[in-house]
UniProtKB/Swiss-Prot annotation:
This is Uncharacterized protein ORF64. Residues 1-15 have a biased composition (Low complexity). Residues 1-22 are annotated as: Disordered.
C-alpha cells in the first residue's frame, strides 16, 4: 500500500531513531502522546497548520505507525489513532486536498466510498484498494483534526457496518433508518444531543387513563315520542355521574368548576412550555460537552484492512518468486480438464458455495471476533445488503448459485454468463469469476482426495516465514507452494487458474513441470 498522508514529509527528513522501540511501547507512552496531541489540537483548532514541520517526538509516532502496518499488536489501533491526530494537526491541508479531489467531505460520501472498499476488497486490484484505503485514511485525519467534529461533516446517521448490524426485515423497514445511531466512527452518536425529557417518564397533570362513560340513552327516543323536552333535559343532566357537584342549576358551583378547569389548563400549558425549554437547554449542553472525537474503533477497523492487504501482498510476492511461465503443456492441460469434468459432483456444490461466501466478504467479517464466520450464507447476505443490493436481488443471486450446473463451470474457460445477471455494481463480473475460480479449485482438491489445502492470502494464522504447501487465493490472482525436496511456487492471474492447476498437478504427479 502506498504511504498515507505525511509520508513525503517524513522521507525528506534525516533518518529517525524510533524512541521507544515498538516492542516497548505501552499504555503510558500512548496516553502521554495523546495528552500532548490533545493539547496541541485544542491550541491550534482555529489556526493553520503549525509551521516548522512535525516535532521529533511526534515524528516517531508516524515511524511507528508505518512499522506496525506489517506487525499487528494490541496497541496498533492506538498508534494509528495517534498518527491520525498528528497528521491532522501538522499536515491537515494535504488530507483535505485529497478529500476535495475525491468529493468525500461528509459521512454520506465517506460511506459510499467505504462500501467500495468492502465490496472490492475480495476482487479489486491493488491500485484500486490502496487508493480507497488512502482516501479512508485521509477522511479519518479530517475527523481527528477536531475535538468536536463539525456538524457539517455529520450529514448521515449510518454507515455500512450499521446496515450490516441492523435488522433488514420488511417489518422494520419504516423505522430502520430512524433508529440507527452510528458510533463506529465517532465517540458520540452522530445525531448529537440526547433528549432526556423524551426518555424520562413525565407524570401527567390529568390522568389520561380515566375512563369516559359515553354510553347511549333513550333521550332522543323519548323526545320523538312527544315527552316534555325541558323536563327530560333537566332529568338527564342531573343524573350524569360526571357532574359530581350536584345539579347543573347550581350556577355558582358550575362557575367555580369552570374557573378551576381553566387554571389547570393554563398550568399544564406552562409545564409543557417549560419541558420544551428544558429539552433545548439539555440538547445544547450535550452538543457542547459530548466528546465527539474520532472513534478508536475506526482506527482499528482501518487496521484490519491494512494488515490483511499487506499480508496478502507480502505472501503473493514471496510465492511469485518461485516459478516462471512454462510453455508446451497443452497435452497435460487437456488431461487435467478432462479429469476435472469427470470429477464434477453435485454434492461439491455446497462446499464450493460456502468457500465462495467466505472468500467474497471482507476480512472484518471473516476474521474479526465480533462477527465470526459461523453462517457463511447469512453473513454474505448481510454483507451484500449492507452495501446497497436489494433483498430480492441477493436472494435471487443465491438461488442461482444453488442451481449452477458445475459441468458448465469446472474444467471450462471462464464465461461471464455462468450466472446470468444484470447489475450496475462496479466490477461485479469479478465476483462471478471468483466463483469460477473456487469451483475449479475445490474440484481439483477433491481429485487429490482433499490432501491439498486452500489458504486465503490474508489469513492471520499463516506464518509468512514458513508458508505451508497448498493453493493460495488472493484478490484477482491465485498461487501455490509445493515443497518436495525443492520448493516450487507461483502466482497467476485469476483468469489463468486452469494453467496454475495444471502446473501444480504436474508437480504433484511427476515432480516435473513441462
Amino acid at each position: 500500500m502506498s504511504s498515507p498522508r505525511g509520508a513525503s514529509s517524513m522521507s525528506s527528513r534525516s533518518p529517525v531513531n524510533l524512541e521507544p522501540e515498538s516492542d516497548s511501547v505501552d499504555s503510558e507512552w500512548v496516553f502521554g502522546k495523546y495528552r500532548l496531541l490533545g493539547a496541541l489540537r485544542s491550541a491550534t483548532l482555529e489556526g493553520e497548520d503549525l509551521e516548522g514541520g512535525i516535532p521529533q517526538e511526534l515524528l516517531n509516532v508516524l515511524v511507528l505507525y508505518e512499522k506496525m502496518k506489517s506487525t499487528k499488536s494490541e496497541l496498533s489501533g492506538f498508534v494509528t489513532y495517534l498518527a491520525l491526530m498528528t497528521l491532522g494537526i501538522f499536515d491537515f491541508d494535504r488530507s483535505l486536498k485529497r478529500l476535495v479531489d475525491e468529493g468525500v467531505l461528509g459521512m454520506f460520501r465517506f460511506n459510499r466510498m467505504l462500501t467500495r472498499v468492502f465490496f472490492g476488497y475480495a476482487t479489486g486490484d491493488d491500485a484500486l484498494i490502496e487508493g480507497l484505503l488512502d482516501t479512508w485514511f485521509a477522511f479519518m485525519v479530517l475527523l481527528a483534526r477536531f475535538p468536536v467534529i463539525p456538524a457539517q461533516l455529520i450529514d448521515s446517521n449510518f454507515c455500512v457496518l450499521c446496515m450490516y448490524e441492523s435488522d433488514h426485515s420488511l417489518a422494520t423497514a419504516d423505522t430502520r433508518f430512524k433508529t440507527i445511531l452510528c458510533d463506529h466512527f465517532t465517540e458520540a452518536s452522530v445525531t448529537a444531543g440526547g433528549d432526556p425529557c423524551d426518555s424520562a417518564e413525565v407524570t401527567a397533570v390529568v390522568k389520561k387513563t380515566t375512563q369516559i362513560d359515553l354510553s347511549l340513552d333513550d333521550f332522543h327516543e323519548r323526545v320523538a315520542r312527544g315527552d316534555n323536552v325541558r323536563e327530560l333535559a333537566v332529568k338527564r343532566d342531573t343524573t350524569l355521574t360526571t357532574r359530581k357537584n350536584g345539579s347543573i342549576n347550581n350556577f355558582t358551583k358550575a362557575l367555580n368548576r369552570a374557573r378551576e378547569t381553566c387554571a389547570m389548563d393554563r398550568m399544564e400549558s406552562s409545564l409543557v412550555e417549560f419541558q420544551k425549554k428544558l429539552r433545548e437547554v439539555n440538547n445544547m449542553i450535550n452538543r457542547l460537552t459530548n466528546p465527539k472525537n474520532l472513534n478508536i474503533f475506526a482506527a482499528e477497523l482501518f487496521n484490519v484492512f491494512v494488515h490483511a492487504h499487506h499480508r496478502r501482498k507480502t505472501i503473493r510476492e514471496r510465492l511469485s518468486d518461485g516459478l516462471g511461465d512454462w510453455k508446451g503443456r497443452a497435452a497435460h492441460m487437456l488431461f487435467l480438464t478432462t479429469k476435472l469434468r469427470t470429477a464434477v459432483d453435485k454434492n461439491l456444490l455446497t462446499t464450493i458455495i460456502t468457500e465462495f461466501y467466505a472468500a467474497a466478504v471482507p476480512p472484518v467479517y471473516r476474521y474479526n471476533h465480533k462477527y465470526n464466520m459461523h453462517a457463511h450464507r447469512v453473513i454474505f447476505f448481510k454483507h451484500m445488503e449492507s452495501i446497497g443490493f436489494t433483498n430480492e436481488g441477493i436472494t435471487a443471486f443465491q438461488y442461482q448459485l444453488n442451481q449452477v450446473d458445475l459441468r458448465e463451470v469446472v474444467g471450462q474457460d471462464y464465461r461471464s454468463d455462468i450466472i446470468p445477471i444484470t447489475t450496475n455494481a462496479e466490477n461485479f463480473n469479478r465476483l462471478t469469476e471468483l466463483f469460477w475460480v473456487i469451483a475449479n479449485i475445490c474440484t481439483f482438491i477433491f481429485i487429490h482426495n482433499k490432501t491439498i489445502k486452500l489458504h486465503h492470502g490474508d489469513a492471520p494464522d499463516l506464518n509468512i516465514d514458513e508458508l505451508p504447501d497448498g493453493l493460495y487465493l488472493f484478490n484477482g490472482s491465485v498461487g501455490f507452494k509445493h515443497d518436495n525436496g525443492e520448493t516450487r511456487s507461483g502466482v497467476w492471474s485469476s483468469e489463468r487458474t486452469l494453467d496454475l492447476l495444471d502446473t501444480y498437478d504436474q508437480l504433484l504427479s511427476t515432480g516435473v513441470i513441462g
